[in-house]
């Protein structure tokens, strides 16, 4: 073929492949076999290889390109990618509907667009004159990460927009936008996730816990070739900035996106009657297992963009949209055995060993049984079929037995009378549910957990010291308390499995750096009962040194904001034990920081008089950083939610504090909303 013929054939092949991609990914209606498709793609690759001057960035062959990135660049979103407020019951949804109508006017006609809430990773795709130029993760809603090269590898994301023809939708624009930011979710279908995990397991690699983690981990690979090998998909659900066309509503926007070549959820619906909205949500709550992907709820949006603008945004949550969350998933499986774990404070916790069962995309083999009373009250027996729930779709726990399925082979379980690690008698304080091993100084299980806690990110942050290393150190007798870490030498690691010269040097450097951590982090690391990051910061801010804290009287401690009688008594009791004071002196002799550093600069009084409670894991700030930020702007941070709490800042895996805040009607912020509140974005 001459050059003109080659150019013409390449263009024909690209047009055909894009058409077949559109039918496969958008219309879900393949019109050629895989073999025919592969033959066309191979022909295109061969022609482009022979004529590299004809390769263009939007060619279907150019999805995987570039070299592995060392890190992802930050991307400022031109418009914030907002989070959604949550509704957990139909009562919550009706309350949201009533607020909308109160703001718009009771007689205002309102339409709602409803679709399943895919549990994936939110991204924004930018197109200039129809060509894909940049893709970014949501990040904190204001700033995300540039993952353009990886997003290009996802076949369901068009590199070149499909010219819209309008079809039967006369209200849908027929022009290509000069600029459009398309927002949606990168996800992995359940079947693809399971197949990926099977391949990883067969190769001896670490498997993913659930499809969302798999999607997020695959998209954030530094090498686009790895992302390309993962079965990622994309659903579009909205837009950011748009230029060159006018979009007036959510329903119209979704149809327009579909015409441009984006997959849009087939289960999206538009309703004008809110009773139909409720029925549709309840229908999918009952049928969620029929979905080919993991969904944790339904998203309801006001259709009309003018009404959306009128309703506006509160914090980081739009008033014009809400997420109806499905209840925690549960399953029935057999309880094989009950074991106990000894924590760093000596609390002995029962753990259920289960026949593996899938709950919400995760294989569950172990679950919490809380305490001895919980087991006794529910008459949970070894061999029982039990109901297992994942609280917040994260933490599995046993709800109770299915008594009707008992066959007489089940065995009652007795809580141990002695510590399984050191043999000391277990004790229980009056009014408490927990049994404890009080052999604080000798119990090896407690020491392992204390070492883990001492080295954790919230405490001294000793990178390279985790559960496995702590167990090795205790088994070999290298440490008898946390202070011994600072006396370790390179020769102590001789013959220790997994410790080569480089790893030893890195760990010793991390331990050395831990000597200069802020005093509040050391206090957290000591593991004083009831004293977390917030209380530790309050102690340091008020008293300034570990000596002052050690020697403070209970009534003096109770005067510190955020330190109540129970916490104060626990602090006094901890330092009343001679072995704990000896530990402090040993740490002091090792050069560990015992005094507060320079006072944190007060940045503003914007949060003066406001009380905050933190719960869950925030996207970029640690709990300590968030607390310090609030305090620096005049706010106060406490550990418990009450009517006096002004805001609860909630992250991933938020627990009972979030539930109590919602019960009391206390405003809930995410990290981005907190930063917006204090003017730090």
Curated annotation (Swiss-Prot):
PANTHER family noted in UniProt: CHROMOSOME TRANSMISSION FIDELITY FACTOR 18, DNA LIGASE
Highest taxon of source: Bacteria
Biological processes, Gene Ontology terms: DNA repair; DNA replication
Required cofactor names: Mg(2+); Mn(2+)
Recorded catalytic activity of this chain's protein: NAD(+) + (deoxyribonucleotide)n-3'-hydroxyl + 5'-phospho-(deoxyribonucleotide)m = (deoxyribonucleotide)n+m + AMP + beta-nicotinamide D-nucleotide
Domain BRCT: 602-681
Enzyme class: ligase
Molecular functions (GO terms): DNA binding; DNA ligase (NAD+) activity; metal ion binding
A UniProt-annotated Pfam family: DNA_ligase_ZBD
InterPro entries assigned to the protein according to its UniProt record, in alphabetical order: BRCT_dom, BRCT_dom_sf, DisA/LigA_HHH, DNA_ligase, DNA_ligase_AS, DNAligase_adenylation, DNAligase_N, Hlx-hairpin-Hlx_DNA-bd_motif
CC annotations in GO: cytosol
Binding site for Zn(2+): 419, 422, 437, 443
Binding annotation for NAD(+): 34-38, 83-84, 115, 138, 185, 301, 325
Known function: DNA ligase that catalyzes the formation of phosphodiester linkages between 5'-phosphoryl and 3'-hydroxyl groups in double-stranded DNA using NAD as a coenzyme and as the energy source for the reaction. It is essential for DNA replication and repair of damaged DNA.
Protein name: DNA ligase
Protein family per UniProt: Belongs to the NAD-dependent DNA ligase family. LigA subfamily.
HAMAP family: DNA_ligase_A
Active-site residues per Swiss-Prot or TrEMBL entry: 117 (n6-amp-lysine intermediate)
Gene3D superfamilies cross-referenced by the UniProt entry: 5' to 3' exonuclease, C-terminal subdomain, 6.20.10.30, BRCT domain, DNA ligase/mRNA capping enzyme, Helix hairpin bin, Nucleic acid-binding proteins
EC number(s) recorded for this UniProt protein: 6.5.1.2
Keywords per UniProt: DNA damage, DNA repair, DNA replication, Ligase, Magnesium, Manganese, Metal-binding, NAD, Zinc
Gene source species: Chloroflexus aggregans (strain MD-66 / DSM 9485)
């Amino acid at each position: 073929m001459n050059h003109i013929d080659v150019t013409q054939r390449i263009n024909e092949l690209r047009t055909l492949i894009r058409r077949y991609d559109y039918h496969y990914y958008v219309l879900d209606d393949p019109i050629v076999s895989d073999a025919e498709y592969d033959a066309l793609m191979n022909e295109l690759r061969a022609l482009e290889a022979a004529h590299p001057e004809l390769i263009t960035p939007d060619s279907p062959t150019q999805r995987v390109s570039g070299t592995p990135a060392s890190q992802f660049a930050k991307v400022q979103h031109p418009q914030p990618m907002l989070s959604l407020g949550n509704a957990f019951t139909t009562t919550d949804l009706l309350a949201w509907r009533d607020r909308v109508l109160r703001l718009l006017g009771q007689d205002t006609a309102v339409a709602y667009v409803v679709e399943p809430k895919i549990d994936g990773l939110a991204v924004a795709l930018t197109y200039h004159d129809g060509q894909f130029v940049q893709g970014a993760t949501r990040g904190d809603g204001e700033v995300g990460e540039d993952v353009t090269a990886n997003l290009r590898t996802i076949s369901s994301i068009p590199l070149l927009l499909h010219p819209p023809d309008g079809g039967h939708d006369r209200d849908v624009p027929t022009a290509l936008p000069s600029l459009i930011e398309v927002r949606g979710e990168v996800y992995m279908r359940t079947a693809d996730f399971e197949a990926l995990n099977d391949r990883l397991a067969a190769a001896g690699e670490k498997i993913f816990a659930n499809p969302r983690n798999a999607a997020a981990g695959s998209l954030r690979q530094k090498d686009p070739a790895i992302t390309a090998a993962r079965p990622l998909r994309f659903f579009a659900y909205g837009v950011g900035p748009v230029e060159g066309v006018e979009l007036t509503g959510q329903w119209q926007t979704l149809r327009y996106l579909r015409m441009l070549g984006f997959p849009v959820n087939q289960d999206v619906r538009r309703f004008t009657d809110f009773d139909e909205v409720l029925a549709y949500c309840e229908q999918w709550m009952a049928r969620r297992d029929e979905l080919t992907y993991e969904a944790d709820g339904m998203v309801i949006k006001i259709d009309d963009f003018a009404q959306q603008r009128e309703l506006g945004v509160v914090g980081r949550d739009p008033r014009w949209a809400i997420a109806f969350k499905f209840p925690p998933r549960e399953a029935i499986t057999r309880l094989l055995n009950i074991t106990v774990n000894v924590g760093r404070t000596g609390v002995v916790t029962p753990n259920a060993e289960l026949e593996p069962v899938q709950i919400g995309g995760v294989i569950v083999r172990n679950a919490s049984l809380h305490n001895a009373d919980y087991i006794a009250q529910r008459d949970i027996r070894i061999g029982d079929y039990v109901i297992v729930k994942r609280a917040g779709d994260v933490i599995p726990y046993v709800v109770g037995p299915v008594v009707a399925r008992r066959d007489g082979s089940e065995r009652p379980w007795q809580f141990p009378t002695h510590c399984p690690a050191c043999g000391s008698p277990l004790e229980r304080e009056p009014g408490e549910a927990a049994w404890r091993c009080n052999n604080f100084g000798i119990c090896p299980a407690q020491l392992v957990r204390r070492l883990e806690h001492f080295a954790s990110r919230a405490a001294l942050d000793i990178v390279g010291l985790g559960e496995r290393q702590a167990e090795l150190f205790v088994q070999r007798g290298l440490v008898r308390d946390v202070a011994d870490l600072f006396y370790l030498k390179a020769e102590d690691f001789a013959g220790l499995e997994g410790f080569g010269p480089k790893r030893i040097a890195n760990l010793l450097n991390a331990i050395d750096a831990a000597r200069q951590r802020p005093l509040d982090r050391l206090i957290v690391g000591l593991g004083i009962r009831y004293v977390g990051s917030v209380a530790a910061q309050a102690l340091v801010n008020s008293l300034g040194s570990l000596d002052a804290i050690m020697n403070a009287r209970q009534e003096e401690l109770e005067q510190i904001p955020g330190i109540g009688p129970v916490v104060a008594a626990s602090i006094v009791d901890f330092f009343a034990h001679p072995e704990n004071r000896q530990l402090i002196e040993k740490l002091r002799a090792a050069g560990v920081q015992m005094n507060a550093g320079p006072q944190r600069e007060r940045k503003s009084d914007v949060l003066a008089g406001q009380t905050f409670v933190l719960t869950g894991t925030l996207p970029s700030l640690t709990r300590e950083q968030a607390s310090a930020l609030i305090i620096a702007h005049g706010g106060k941070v406490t550990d418990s939610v009450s009517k006096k709490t002004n805001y609860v800042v909630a992250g991933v895996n938020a627990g009972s504090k979030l539930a109590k805040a919602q019960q009391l009607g206390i405003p809930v912020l995410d990290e981005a909303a907190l930063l917006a509140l204090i003017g730090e974005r």
